[in-house]
Amino acid sequence: YRQQGYNKRFRMGGNLTYHQPDMGMKILNYGLNVDFLTNQYGDFFIWRSPTEVYKPSPFTNMGREENNFHIDPFINYVNPENGTSHKIKGRFYHSADNIVRPSSGASITDILGNMGTNAQTIQNIAGGDYSSLYPALVGIGSGLINGNLEDAMNGVFTSLGNIFPNATTADYCDLISWVMDNGIPGDLGSIQNGQLPSDLIPWLSNVMNPSRNDSKTKTDKSYNYYLDYQFNKKWDGGAQITTGMTYEHVRYDSSIMDEVYKSDNVAAFFQYDQRFWDRLSVSAGVRAEYYRVDNHYREAETKILGTKVPFRPVFRAGLNYQLADYSFIRASIGQGYRNPSINEKYLRKDIGGVGIYPNLDIKPEKGYNAELGFKQGYKIGNFQGFVDVAGFYTEYKDMVEFQFGLFNNADYSMINSISDAIRMLMDGKGFGIGAQFHNVSKAQIYGMEISTNGVYNFNKNTKLFYNLGYVYTEPRDADYKERNELEDAYSDALQMKEKSNTGKYLKYRPKHSFKATVDFQWKRINLGANVAWKSKILAVDYLMLDEREKQQKDLMDYVRTILFGQSRGETLASYWKKHNTDYATVDLRFGVKATKEVAFQFMVNNLLNKEYSYRPMAVAAPRTFVLKMDVTF
């Protein structure tokens, strides 16, 4: 449904298990699972304009080709006579992927033609007649004198309108993207000395060549080796222990970074479980992890008795108590710790044309979570099922979040000031739009969830299955006040802020969500429906939107207009304000199981044809009809 969007997948796999005979009560089996996936897809992260929501921006005209393969050997041994078991799991995983263009970009002649380029005006400027540029000069002068950026920008766009009378903001993006692909004059430093770049003529000659410079395909490769051993011992009194070790080695060959990264992760774990009075079950465990990347041998440290050790222990505990028949209460608390992955910390990748940029300063995130829940079974007439209610609380320190921004493609640094933008132009590698993972000092996420699932039995051939759930979440940015004070002091027009508003909520999260699934089955026929409802998104990235009150537009507003388009008076900000609301969707499906091996299903997704977005510029699919056939053999 999105222009230039496609997904072609081929998957093949299998498994082989050998059960050792003549073992008596003991059980021994071993084997392996194998899976291969090849995937080609095209997509985009940024639209062309608010009236072309299913068309890609030229900045994000990219797709990927990838091939994945893994083989998972395993060995299981169980001895019921002494209540022990041994399990060994392994995995070798290989992945290779590279960037492709779903379509070739427009040629310079097409771009200039769409913009209605006035050749006479360009010729007049070349001949020394600068009258068409007067509006820009007057506007900039007025802006400098009066401190009014709007006057300056209106003057600039008026002058550009004299040269490109038919141009839209999307056309300017086409032109900028074309120049980024073909480079800019390398000798921009001579402009500071009042001279034209020495390589201007060769560059202009290349610009007038309608063919783009196609770069050589670069393939990223990763290799993953995983081994896990688990020992379990059960006693007649209801006690059991589970212990073991895990080792994982990752090698990543990055063609873009021209580097090879290696990581090792070693973990040891122990868990004790005990059952009392056939009603109460308690559990407690600890896991200690050591992690390193290349020669960084201490990615994580813990102080024990005044001495720093290069591993991190985390603890968890929980209980489950049966109050009555089909009635249970549970509670759990646990620590969490996660090291940034190689992708998050070291790599430069492209996903849908949006770059993922490295951040060597990112730190591990840590925290804890707690949950209290109640589960009750019920049987009312022909209804039977369970209802579950739970409250949860999670607190993070140095929580890892992504932040969208503009980046200098020369050194992959974020453009965070006007001087950074000037340096990007001087470097001559252009800019990129993308995300960088960074730490949010402190975050709290708490809320409650209620759900029920079950079945209504009409007779042995006719049943109604249902699953309903509601989640309330309070995703708090605990340091938002301090961050707002810091951002209020920003003086550079291009300095990036954390999010689109000054509120207390984390980005890209709704407060409320509800989902219901109902399936009516009669013999081989199935009729089902999905109903989903979500509340609006509470905050997004500052690069996309700025919802703060302001007297006049600032420089970033004009940057957003160019990057994300303005068409028929509509901008991303006005579109998001209109469409970032509570929304509901309905999907229907009808299926027939023709034989034991063959089944057909007809689906209507987004039955009400609701136009909604789960993030800026991610407009979901309109009403879609799908016919599906499943064959099992």
Q: Residue locations for each model-derived region?
A:
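Membrane-embedded beta-barrel scaffold of Gram-negative outer-membrane proteins
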Residues: 87-91, 95, 322, 328-332, ...
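Transmembrane beta-strands of outer-membrane beta-barrel pores
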Residues: 1, 20, 36-40, 79, ...
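Gram-negative outer-membrane beta-barrel transporters
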Residues: 386, 390-395, 413-543
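Flexible loop and strand-edge segments within Gram-negative outer membrane beta-barrel domains
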Residues: 2-15, 19-78, 82, 92-113, ...
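C-terminal beta-signal and adjacent terminal beta-strands/loops
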Residues: 337-338, 395-398, 402-407, 532-573, ...
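Surface-exposed extracellular loop regions of Gram-negative outer-membrane beta-barrel proteins
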Residues: 1-15, 41-49, 55, 89-91, ...
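Structural signature of Gram-negative outer-membrane beta-barrels, strongest in the C-terminal barrel
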Residues: 234-242, 246-250, 254-394
